[in-house]
Structures are given as C-alpha cells and as structure tokens.
Curated annotation (Swiss-Prot):
<dbReference type="GO" id="GO:0072005">
    <property type="term" value="P:maintenance of kidney identity"/>
</dbReference>
<dbReference type="InterPro" id="IPR003893">
    <property type="entry name" value="Iroquois_homeo"/>
</dbReference>
<dbReference type="GO" id="GO:0000981">
    <property type="term" value="F:DNA-binding transcription factor activity, RNA polymerase II-specific"/>
</dbReference>
<dbReference type="GO" id="GO:0006357">
    <property type="term" value="P:regulation of transcription by RNA polymerase II"/>
</dbReference>
<keyword id="KW-0805">Transcription regulation</keyword>
<keyword id="KW-0804">Transcription</keyword>
<dbReference type="GO" id="GO:0045944">
    <property type="term" value="P:positive regulation of transcription by RNA polymerase II"/>
</dbReference>
<dbReference type="GO" id="GO:0001840">
    <property type="term" value="P:neural plate development"/>
</dbReference>
<dbReference type="GO" id="GO:0007420">
    <property type="term" value="P:brain development"/>
</dbReference>
<dbReference type="InterPro" id="IPR001356">
    <property type="entry name" value="HD"/>
</dbReference>
<dbReference type="GO" id="GO:0000122">
    <property type="term" value="P:negative regulation of transcription by RNA polymerase II"/>
</dbReference>
<dbReference type="InterPro" id="IPR008422">
    <property type="entry name" value="KN_HD"/>
</dbReference>
<protein>
    <recommendedName>
        <fullName>Iroquois-class homeodomain protein irx-3</fullName>
    </recommendedName>
</protein>
<keyword id="KW-0524">Neurogenesis</keyword>
<dbReference type="GO" id="GO:0045665">
    <property type="term" value="P:negative regulation of neuron differentiation"/>
</dbReference>
<dbReference type="GO" id="GO:0009953">
    <property type="term" value="P:dorsal/ventral pattern formation"/>
</dbReference>
<dbReference type="GO" id="GO:0030424">
    <property type="term" value="C:axon"/>
</dbReference>
Length: 448
C-alpha cells in the first residue's frame, strides 16, 4: 500500500494478491510458517499478543498492520467488517447535512424564531392600544413573548425601536417616564432602559431636544453664579486697582508707588502733583510715565488706610506697613527693604544692579553707583571703589562688600538724619529728592 500524498513509496503487501475474502485457513497456513505475521504483530504488540493473533489466524483481517506504527492516527487498528478497498482511514468521512443550532433543533416548535410580520402584528396591536404609555411591564413582555414565540430580549428591543421611531417621526403621544411609583418600584429595570434610550438619542441622533433644553436650564444657575462671581471679582479689582491693564514693568512699579502714597498720605495736593495736568517742572521721563497713568477713580478718595489686602495686588501687599501711624520712624526703612526684595535689589550691588538701573531711571540713563553728580552732596566715600561694577562684577562685589561693612556707622547716621519717606521710589522732582532716594537705597544695601 502506498501513500503518495504523504511522500511514502509503495510497501510490499503482507498477503498474496490472489487472497480470498474468506480464506482464513489458507492465509493462516501461508503466513504462519514464514513467521511474517508474528514479526509484524510483535512490532505492533507485545510477544503474547502476537502469538495469540498468529494462533487465531487473524492475519488476513489486519491488512495495514505494518503501517500502523508509522501512522497510528489515520484510523482504527482493527478493520474487521469492511474490506480494505472500501474506504481508507485517511479519506474524508461523510458529514451530516446540518449541525444543531444551540439547544433547539430545526424541527423543534419551541425554538424562537425571527421577527416576522405575523409575530410583530401582535406587538403592533398592543402598541396601538397603549399609545399613551408604550412601556410594557415585565409580565406583559413575558405574555407577548409567549404569544409571538420570541425571547424577552427581542420583545424589549422591538418596543425600544418602535418608541425611537415614533419620536423621530414626531408622533409621540405619551409623556416620557410617565409611570407611577408603584410600577416604578416593581419594575425598576424599565426605567433604567428608558434612561439608556434617552442617552442614545441624545448622543447618537440628537433628537430629544426637550431633554437637552431642560438640562441647559438646570445648568443655567451654576453658570449665572460663576458669571456673577467673575463680574464681582473684576469690579473689586477695578475699584481697588485701576492699573491692572498695564503690562510694562515700569508702569507696574509706578502703580504700586502711587497706591502707597494714596494710602499713607490722604491729602489732595499729592494727587494733584501726580496727575497729568500738573504744572510743576518735572524731568522728561517722569512726565512721560505720569501721562500714561489714567486718572484715579473717585472711590479712592474715601478709602480707609487699613483696608483688606487683595491677593492679586502683590506690590500693595508688600509695601503696606502693619501700622503706619504708630511706627512712623520704621515705616520708610521697612518699605524700602520690601520694595528692594520685590524688585530684585539684593545685597550684591555689583552683579545684580544692572537689571534695576533700566527700570525707573531709564530715560535719564543714570547708573546709581557710577554717577558722581547724583551723589555729590552726600559725601559718601565708598562709592569711588565701586566704579567698575559692569566690567568686573565679582571683584567689585568683594570690594563693595568690604567697604559697606567698614562704613556701616556712617550709613546708619545718614539714615537717621534723613526725614521719613513714604516710599523708596517716589517720582523725582528736585535734586535734593534724588539725593534722599540714593541715600535710602545705599543704606538698605549696606544694612542687608
């Protein structure tokens, strides 16, 4: 027997070609003396089984016994009833005409069928009778499923599709979720199904506009509250600070200075001096900056001194003293140190002083430590070694720090002789005011 599809060549048969189908004794007498059957069966089975098979002369009914060890999976080992030429084990077996589907057979009357016109006619009749409340209860669904031979899932899906179709065609004759409390408690799953249907309609088809409008109406109070809070915060900021729209750092600095002066000095002549209509001769840079400032709102005239600080007004919070009337002597130095910390004036005058010189005195192009005419009336001796700050910052820093340590008593005396200032950065109008500002800055640098 050969297996050309498997790549094996012809194998010599164990029996002669003129074998008869019933020649049991002949085949046994022919194969037994030669020992061929015993050798084959000993390779397949053990020695006792091979001897028993040879004794019973079953060799004629085992045609492929030599090939069984090679292909044990091709078929059963004993082909006792059929002749070898009828069907081989490697051939395909006939299959049944159909396979059973699920737990029901095709002829079973209890098998659920698809929705047809006959089955849906019952559902349509029930829907027409209950147009005002097209939500069947669980018992009604079971009854309709038995009548139409459909499952509960099919019945529920059909009613959901029917309600959605009627909503789409604007033929709704019922109020959504119109069930009573008793039915709702008994059949809570139906309400969940209705909510799921409404969510699908809103998300997928955007049909149920009434639910959307009701949700928007429910959301309106929250939005009104948020909008009111936004307008309130904006109005408070506009009343307290009229310069929130200024983006230039110099303008913000001037805004903080003006606010501090208005808090500490409740006198109209200071505001007149800071207004854009003032006739007092002023430097060009200060005139330009004061022209940019809008007129202060009238609410600030009666503003109390100890008002509540705002979170968004950091400069005002930093420059406002705790009790300006009780401590007039320390107010100027505290404000000076706070403003210096706010505007990055740190105790290293050599390396970090260049960034400050371009803020309040950019139009005059003055370097506070390099201009001799600015400090000529003070008689301070430690400004001369610090003339090379821009080119050699580290060396100048070390020299200036040693000089400031040695000259600390002189700066303290200067601070005592200077009258108390409201802020460290007032608009400069006279030369003497410039001397006072420079002295305050140098004293703050040396003391820190």
């Amino acid at each position: 027997m050969s297996f050309p599809q498997l790549g094996y060549q012809y194998i010599r048969p164990l029996y002669p070609s003129d074998r008869q189908s019933v020649g049991v004794t002949r085949s046994g007498t022919e194969l037994s003396p030669a020992g061929t059957l015993s050798n084959v069966l000993s390779s397949v089975y053990g020695a006792p089984y091979a001897a028993a098979a040879a004794a019973q002369a079953y060799g004629a009914f085992l045609p492929y016994s030599a090939e069984l060890p090679i292909f044990p999976q091709l078929g059963s080992q004993y082909d006792m009833k059929d002749s070898p030429g009828v069907q081989h084990a490697a051939f395909s077996h006939p299959h049944p005409a159909f396979y059973p589907y699920g737990q029901y057979q095709f002829g079973d009357p209890s098998r659920p069928k698809n929705a047809t016109r006959e089955s849906t006619s019952t559902l349509k009749a029930w829907l027409n009778e209950h147009r005002k409340n097209p939500y069947p209860t669980k018992g009604e669904k079971i009854m309709l499923a038995i009548i139409t031979k459909m499952t509960l899932t099919q019945v529920s899906t059909w009613f959901a599709n029917a309600r959605r179709r009627l909503k789409k065609e604007n033929k709704m004759t019922w109020a959504p979720r119109s069930r009573t409390d008793e039915e709702g408690n008994a059949y809570g799953s139906d309400h969940e199904e209705d909510k799921h249907e409404d969510e699908e309609e809103i998300d997928l088809e955007n049909i149920d506009t009434e639910d959307i409008e009701s949700k928007e109406d429910l959301d309106d109070p929250d939005t009104d509250i948020h909008s009111d809070s936004k307008t309130d915060t904006r109005s408070d900021s506009e009343v307290s600070d009229g310069f929130e729209d200024l983006n230039v750092p110099e303008d913000r600095l001037l805004k903080s200075v003006v606010g501090q002066r208005q808090l500490l000095n409740e006198e109209p002549q200071d505001k007149c001096a800071l207004s854009s209509d003032a006739k007092v001769p002023q430097p060009a840079c200060e005139q330009i900056k004061l022209n940019r400032l809008p007129p202060s709102p009238p609410q600030e005239n009666n503003m109390p001194v100890a008002h509540k600080p705002k979170i968004w007004s950091l400069a005002e919070t930093a420059t406002t003293p705790d009790n300006p009337r009780n401590s007039p002597n320390t107010g100027g130095s505290v404000n000076t140190q706070n403003l210096i910390a706010q505007h990055r004036l740190i105790a290293s005058p050599g390396s970090r002083f260049q960034g400050w010189t371009g803020r309040a005195f950019s139009a005059q192009q003055l370097s506070l430590l390099n201009s001799a005419h600015f400090l000529q009336g003070l008689g301070v001796s430690h400004t001369a070694p610090c003339s090379g700050n821009a080119s050699f910052p580290k060396a100048a820093e070390s020299k200036c720090s040693t000089n400031s340590l040695t000259d600390r008593p002189s700066t303290v005396d200067i601070e005592k002789t200077i009258p108390v200032l409201n802020t460290a950065f007032q608009p400069v109008q006279r030369r003497s005011q410039n001397h006072l500002d420079a002295a305050m800055i140098l004293s703050a640098l040396s003391s820190s």
